[in-house]
Amino acid sequence: MNSRKSLSQPSFSNKVIDKNQLKNLIVWAFRNYGIARAANMADKLKDLGFHYATQAGISLSLEDLRIPPSKKSLLLSTIEEIKNTENKYRRGEITTVERFQKVIDTWNNASESLKQEVIEYFKETDPLNSVYMMAFSGARGNISQVRQLVGMRGLMADPQGQIIDLPISSNSREGLTVTDYFISSYGARKGLVDTALRTADSGYLTRRLVDVSQDVIIREVDCKTKKGIILEDLVDTQKVLINLEQALAGRVLAENVFHPEKGSLIAHTRQDISPNLAQEIVRAGIKKVLVRSPVTCNSRSSVCQYCYGWNLAHGRLVDLGEAVGIIAAQSIGEPGTQLAMRTFHTGGVFTGELAEQIYSPIDGKLTNLDFLSYMEVRTRHGEQALMTEKPTQVIIESSGKQKSIINLSKGTTLLVDNNEVVSKDQVIAESPRRNRLMIERAQKHVLSDLSGKICFSNLTVEETDNNQYTTRITKTGGLIWVLSGEVYNIPDSANIPVNKADQVNPGTILAQTELINQYSGKVRIYQNTSSSITNIQIITESVTVPACYIRTDVINKKESYILETDKKQRFLFKSFPDQKISDGHIVAELISDTYKTTSGGIIKYLDLNVSKKKTGPEKDAYDILSPGYILWISEETHEINKDSSLLLVNNGDVIESGTELVKNIFSKSSGIIEIIQKDGIVREIIIKPGFIYKLTDFYSIHDKSRGFLRPGETLHGNISTDKLVYWEYIENEQTPYILIRPVIVYSIPEIKSSLIENLTSQKVNQTKLKLVKRTVFRDGERVKSIDGVHLVTTNLVAEINHHDPNLVSAIEFLAKEDSSNCFALGLSTFETLSIKSIDNKVEKEQSQTRIIVSDGEYIQPLTVVASTEIISMSKGFVEEIHVEKNTSRRILLTTSIDNKVFDLHQQNTLVQVGDWIRCGDLISESIISLDSGQITHISQESATLRIARPYLVSNAAILHVDNNALIRKGETLAVLVFDRAKTGDIIQGLPRIEEILEARKKTDVLLNPHDILDASFNLYIECGLALYEAARLSFQEIQLLLVKEVQLVYQSQGVNISDKHIEVIVRQMTSKVKIENGEETGYLPGELVELQKIEQTNKSMTSRNKLNASYRPILLGITQASLNTESFISAASFQETTKVLTEAAISGKLDWLRGLKENVIIGRLIPAGTGFNMYDSHNDVANKKDINKNISTDNSPPSVRDDLDDIILDDRTARNYFNNKTVD
């Protein structure tokens, strides 16, 4: 009865039940009442929720998006602050980088303030607002999205990750402008793409984690270790991320816990910590607790029940046979997918957390500033501040003597001074978050807003010589002033008629460039229609070739130009009209079949003199230098390259024309066949025309097997000829034959052409045309062809006698008056002058170009053809003329616009001549200058200010200008070099986790785990610790560091993962050592062995008086740890299969099938869960049962437990029941 009564007493929770409270409620029900009742309650809650949601009729309309009225004033104050920043920049008090950072931080703070206003406004005016309830109950949406709906969208990042300093001040309720919309679209697209890519990354991370930890199974109850790890609050920059109470739940104590004041025992060793006990420990004021942990567990290749603690799903001690490795891998991998998705929802909105801001908790005065602990620094906003060089503290004392102590870590920037009054919630300091922010070195170009003269102020410059150029770098920060004026570029060849201090008017010529010809001739002006470029040609020579004309005709189905002479010789043009030609250029080729053969053959020269090397622009043929003859022995050559089995004829066969040689290949001529084959492949079939004579005695031919037989000569005593023939000896089926082959003789006469005579009769000095006969074949060359070739070509070739690069020769087609289709052939030589070449350095508005000569005019050498004049645009004075070498030639004019005159009205001035004035400074007691500049003149009546613009450059900036140099608007003054944080939502999260777990050796990150491990190991060895202890302790240090680093990434995204999951993974990464010297253990240097295994080996070596192996701890990334696992089956199924299996085979490895993966691959029952107890004896089970009785659970009523045991029968209950039966 009592148990029923205790159950009927309700538990009262007086809170708003949002998503988190709902979680806690269900966990409480699950822990106290079991899975069935908790599920039932969750069902009822769901029905309750739907019922009231239906009755209330929650809907979402545009009216629910309420914009807080304070938004307008907040925006106005922010814009005012931005104006002040811009003014500071214009005064040269901050650099462009500091301005950008200040603008971004100002907008970011405005956006955050507005977010708070939105929350307050909803809370106070409309707590039942649909949007507010939805976001804050945790049902849908988050505060960041609500901020964009009713606050402001804020700052966005561009595709490169750079923040755009133009914020979107409107929200979705007010609507976006076109600019806002375009800026927004960057982030939205980025979110979609990133999500797709990162989901795959996250999946691969999970796979690697599973692989590295799949063999971690709970195999024993207690490993009897005395070691553990100390748990405390996880703090990051003064913010508690995971409190001790949260961290303790589900752990087992490694030592007794006593009350620090009373001394009473709170909990004993090996007791598991329930949430209630954790609360009690924290209430007692205990800050650090030693607990058992998977990283200190002594079990070989597994974890014991006590070191693991609770199975967090059930809220009680983990079962034997539980595959905790896989649970750990999934627990770490799964949130990765959520992290990948998170970018998508905020859509690239920038959230700036470059520094953690420390606020004043009370109104008061800041005291206790120890100046020895600080150094003066410039903040990223360009303000002076103090930075702590060591951890220190400041005190804020209110008027009521209330004191608040604030601890500052090293590197914190203090923004207020000693004894300065601060108000509550004022930002007093910033601590950097640099340790986990990726810093990159960036550059920012400072561009001039004015044209004018450069003046350096307080700038120390250091010059460094690099191979080709000198780099100027600022050693100290300072100002670059640009004194306003008009700057004109002057071409190098220009003549400058003005002098320094001359007065000029609009239209005055400042510089003049003249275009002069080298040769006399006739002027021809070409105006390019597509641009304003004008070319002027001076024609030094022009000649028309007589007795020939050009017309178009169709040759080989292609329209071509044909040159015909009055002797009916026809030439095919190889050039086109107005084409520029060089010496040896082939203009045309004679159309003739005189030297065309019908097939291939052998070529022999007779009394023919040809050039030794190939000539012409293409170097493709030999010039024939004298008359002579070409002897041609024809033969038809088919290139086959087919198998010899496909042949339809045999070597030595005599065939008729049209015979099929191989399939679809026919002979064109009759003759005897010669087959050339290699390795069973027929390369060529040669058909040799001629007559065959059978020989009775071969040896009478002496030593020759081929040659020419002239008329009147005899061969073999009885073979004679009446014309020149070619003979060769052939042997067919051991019978000798003589093949007599016909020879065609081609005569090549001396070149005489009316065309040449006509040309030479003209007195041409520079360009001629000559006829040249050319051949592409060498003496004795065998020409492989079926259709025939041109043995000799007759070409019309240009002969140019001048070698001046300024003179160009060209072919011209001159229209004939009597015919529209015919042209005369002209040759001209001319000099080209381009007007573009003289005005490309000068802007069009400042210059005018005049062509002084007219088309068709005949001019003498060194005549001015055109001139470009650079003219003044304004009235003023010539202040500077720079014509030094190695710099641009420039002229500086000062006009009335560049000076500003102040009427003093007899007032005393507060400035002197030469003073630099910044905008907002006083000239006299009542006159404020709105411009920056330099005072150039002061009289009783007036003061003159030369307008200028100051640019602040930081130290280590790269200067692009010299002092007193002239610069134009938009040119680079300097490049500022600075460090900036890489922006990123979770995009930095996943790669960061991967980097930690893969133990990457990054150089630019402060945390290099490999270096830390080495350093701590060396330190412990120096302190005299044994090798094993030094390795174990250095491992433990790095383990805790890695766990903390992973937690920081996940916590920054609001994802809670229990430490023990990360510890299981880290344990696998830090289980191996690298052998340095194997001594007598049989291990090789560089081999990776488990720490416990090598220590056991060393102990056995010591007992046998043998030398121990030396080693050092090594940190493996998860991929490497997977590949170096004991099981080669598991490693091979992960990556590098061939390599793993080869190494395993060579070293004769055994796989004991301890893990899950190798058993799955083999096809056995996995050694976890129900498959775990297969080999255990009953006695062991009995012992475990007794031990389990001693383990305390949480403080829920025993009656509740007993009453609910039969509601759900899970594996464990069934197994325990079965085991108890067998023991009894």
Swiss-Prot record:
GO cellular component, one term: mitochondrion
Keyword Chloroplast in record: yes
Annotated keywords: Chloroplast, DNA-directed RNA polymerase, Metal-binding, Nucleotidyltransferase, Plastid, Transcription, Transferase, Zinc
Catalytic reaction(s) noted: RNA(n) + a ribonucleoside 5'-triphosphate = RNA(n+1) + diphosphate
Short name of any one Pfam family annotated for the protein: RNA_pol_Rpb1_4
Cofactor: Zn(2+)
Protein name: DNA-directed RNA polymerase subunit beta''
Species: Porphyra purpurea (Red seaweed)
Underlying gene: rpoC2
